[in-house]
Amino acid sequence: MGGQGGRTLRTRVYVDGYNFYYGCLKGSRFKWLNLHALFENQILPSILHMGPGRSPDRHELLPVAVKYFTATIVETAAKGPDSVSSQDAYHTALENYCAGRLQIIKGYFSVSQVRAPKVDHANPSKWPRHCERVEIWKFEEKQSDVQLALHAYHDALTGDVDQVVIASNDTDLAPALQMIRDNTNVVVGLVNPTCDHRRPPNTSLVQLSHWTREHISERELAAAQLPRVVPRKRGVSLKPTSWYARPDLLTPALILATKVRGSKGAAFKWLSTPNEHLRGAVPLDLLESDEGAAAVITYMEDWIAKHPKSGNME
């Protein structure tokens, strides 16, 4: 842990998957995220924490650098028709691309029918106990936050780490951080998983941390994306079409490009290559806006009309 010019801290990152998703990724084009690269190349190099000798600490990620706590989506409660398959593709891609540097630890979802008080819209201030009770579906993520807390505390207590980095804004983790502070000399870092400067980290977590990263930028998320195609033992994991910035614009362009190029892989290769006929822009980037998509579609339709039998769209 010692050394000239500051300590070298054996570091592990603990990611609260759903807290991270809802804080940083929901509705964004950054869901196909390489969590290991995000922390290794973006987050940790930005952290300046002074050790006892008033020299900056160095962050050295352990071989298992990231523990990612999540739960498999229940199909009956999924919000999208491809939610289950997309999550599975992402988890498989993470495990294969990060090759042992990232561990996925899963809890589970509980889906049950319960009775709960209904808000009285005629009198919103009416106490819940006085409101009508109705039957509802209750969705609960189970064990993820408990497992994160236990893993972080275990790793700190057994001397596996010199620094734990918690990527969550869930105050349920405060007792675990308190125990780490009370019973070990391990450094506690906090990363608030939000891109919104107006959503500050919870005070109770900040007070228990040696340092805090208050937000993650979109630039950092963009710089830490997995490749569109990730090889696995049998086959590949593909970034879901619905995880791009504008799937509604990408889908028709992909259909046209596949028609000409012959396969979806070849179509994506064309869409990912700067095109001189589109002023050097990458078609895939243009498909993030209505105006850009119109330019791409118009170009492809014109090209197809002029070259009906060719598969080598320029």
PLM features: residue spans?
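Domain-level signal for Mg2+-assisted phosphodiester chemistry and nucleotide/NA-binding surfaces
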Residues: 1-124, 133-137, 187-189, 194
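A generic secondary-structure signal
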Residues: 45-49, 93, 151-155, 179, ...
